[in-house]
Amino acid sequence: MFFQLAPPSSLAYFESLVRDDEHFPLLEAAASIAQDEYPDLDIQQVLGDVDQLQARLHRRVSNDAPPLQRLRALAQFFYRDMGFGGNVNNFYDPDNSHLNAVLKTRRGIPISLAVLWLELAQGLGLKAMGVGFPGHFMVKVSLPQGQVVVDPFTGESLSREDLIERLQPHQQAMGLVGDNEVPLGLYLQPCPPRDIVARMLRNLKEIHRTAEDWPRLLAVSERLVRLLPTVWDELRDRGLVLAELGHLQQAERDLAGYLAQADDAPDRAAITQRLRDIRRALH
């Protein structure tokens, strides 16, 4: 007897990618986000497109080039020769978070550009990491001469003074001034790959929530629950979206699960009431 195994769903595929932190495939996991919008997308083709960029870049850099020269070659190649840059005209277009679209249009937001930039930088042997800077994702490279922080939206390298200036609105809004001020270095800690993918998904989550696009928001929430299985806020948010879509049994399960875990949650009373309303509608 012969039988054909069905390929895994895009969600199951994503879940398999993000299961293990030790060998987390950042580029592949980030690229797979786009399968919600492009269900027939060939992720291996996306990875192949990045490999082609990597090969073109390698031809421009000698094997014995020092790290600083490699970094300069990457900046020239990525921003000037290939034309990658920030989408200043349509910053909130969901395609800015879909790597297949970013590769095609050469336009994205800081974090999607950073994922591509990091892949190319690491392919050159650079010690490059993502940085979850408040409000604007950054990348940094450790060189023998010191640390370089780059804005992936523009390709600009930022001085300490630039970074402090960019931080001021966040610090003032959070009351982190004077005696409560947080050292700059704490904002420049490496961002793990799992957190990078979570930030990409949360960008899409906010776009779809603002548009009240519940089906797309549910697709993003499904990924976040699998990516962050112990972040109970994501379970709650999926439950609320399910309720909006009329899937009350699944919503009941998620909201009850959230309340079972979030004893001290500030929204406990509101979610309890929402759960009561759902149960009344069910019974």
Language model segments and positions:
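A structural boundary/capping signal
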Residues: 1-283
